[in-house]
Amino acid sequence: MTQSVCILGVTGSIGQSTLKILGQHPDKYSVFAVSAHSRISELVEICKQFRPKVVVVPEQKIAELKTLFAQQNISAIDVLAGQEGLVDIASHTDVDIVMAAIVGAAGLLPTLAAVKAGKRVLLANKEALVMSGEIMMQAARDHQALLLPVDSEHNAIFQSLPHNYLQADRTGQPQLGVSKILLTASGGPFLNHSLEQLVHVTPQKACKHPNWSMGQKISVDSATLMNKGLELIEACHLFSISEHFVTVVVHPQSIIHSMVQYVDGSTLAQMGNPDMCTPIAHALAWPERLQTNVPALDLFEYSQLNFQAPDTQKFPALNLARQAMRAGGLAPTILNAANEIAVEAFLMERIGFTSIPQVVEHTLEKLENTAAESIECILDKDKVARSVAQQYIKYWRLK
């Protein structure tokens, strides 16, 4: 019997890699529902091949989608709109597995809906957990959802931890013999740039990652090291560990995806070629394994693997994220919201590359940090933080 899959963000890089794996295993998985934000022509091609029962797009894209469906003689697919539609498919009774791959805060509510519906949730949307933190993790426990990490680093940590680690008490301290998590980072395309060179970075250059094929937003986050900062926060929540037990290690080759150190001196690492199909396949089938077309790692190709500490002077975003996690409450929500606005402004060439962390720092300083008591207060703070960041950028440009 096949398992039914819902893919939130099907036209993005994670969504495409997920389809690749599902297409290789039609005897195990079927696509029940998908969502897309803007690439409607690509969505139609996906629907022709995988024939989902339900599709969700923004309200303003429904007419375009239905026109293309009619032209391609595609029928028997329900079309839903907006956040309500996303929540509906993520929590649908016919869905077994939800791939949460919507980028940014927009993925929070549908991801939480999937968790509250007790689904197997493959978490690629790190921002959802950065914002909701323990609310999301408590919901997973209350509703017996299986929350499995898809980010290569968190998937590597998951594979390197004791098999029952997620069932251990959530104390913020390492459990079951674990002493530390080593979160690896490629360092991004500007690892060896000077501060002066970073001032002149363009969006085109920032979107060219040396090792991974990714969307624009995550590529820029990787270049600023904010992506690693968000992943640090995600790791703290997923594995219930305080931020000072998580060390970021720059590893330019992206072969070791992360490591776990133990009290007996052991260090366990998960290694592999940088291909998102590997962690996706792992999360889909865990505790079993799926065949993929990812080549096995050839160790003879690598004469050496390099490691170094991150330069937080050149890349202050990492420390901003660590400070937000340390502060707790709504600070991570403020951090994430301001970063999304700043990255969007950079991609539109409204601010420079080195201005991104400055916008984030200003917004964190401007807003009061209070307890994250509910999803409603998280969403309210997200909205306010975006407004503050936008106003700061607007003022900056007028100076």
UniProtKB/Swiss-Prot annotation:
Its cofactor is Mg(2+); Mn(2+). One of its GO terms (biological process) is isopentenyl diphosphate biosynthetic process, methylerythritol 4-phosphate pathway involved in terpenoid biosynthetic process. It comes from the Bacteria. It catalyses: 2-C-methyl-D-erythritol 4-phosphate + NADP(+) = 1-deoxy-D-xylulose 5-phosphate + NADPH + H(+). 1-deoxy-D-xylulose 5-phosphate binds at K126, S152, E153, S186, H209, S222, N227, K228, E231. Pathway: Isoprenoid biosynthesis; isopentenyl diphosphate biosynthesis via DXP pathway; isopentenyl diphosphate from 1-deoxy-D-xylulose 5-phosphate: step 1/6. InterPro entries: DXP_reductoisomerase (IPR003821), DXP_reductoisomerase_C (IPR013644), DXP_reductoisomerase_N (IPR013512), DXPR_C (IPR026877), DXPR_C_sf (IPR036169), NAD(P)-bd_dom_sf (IPR036291). One of its GO terms (molecular function) is NADPH binding. Its EC number is 1.1.1.267. NADPH binds at T11, G12, S13, I14, N125, E127, G215. Coiled coil: none annotated. The keyword Disulfide bond does not apply. It is an enzyme of class 1 (oxidoreductase). Mn(2+) binds at D151, E153, E231. It holds the Pfam family DXPR_C. Keywords: Isoprene biosynthesis, Manganese, Metal-binding, NADP, Oxidoreductase. Belongs to the DXR family. Catalyzes the NADPH-dependent rearrangement and reduction of 1-deoxy-D-xylulose-5-phosphate (DXP) to 2-C-methyl-D-erythritol 4-phosphate (MEP). This is 1-deoxy-D-xylulose 5-phosphate reductoisomerase. It comes from Acinetobacter baumannii (strain SDF).
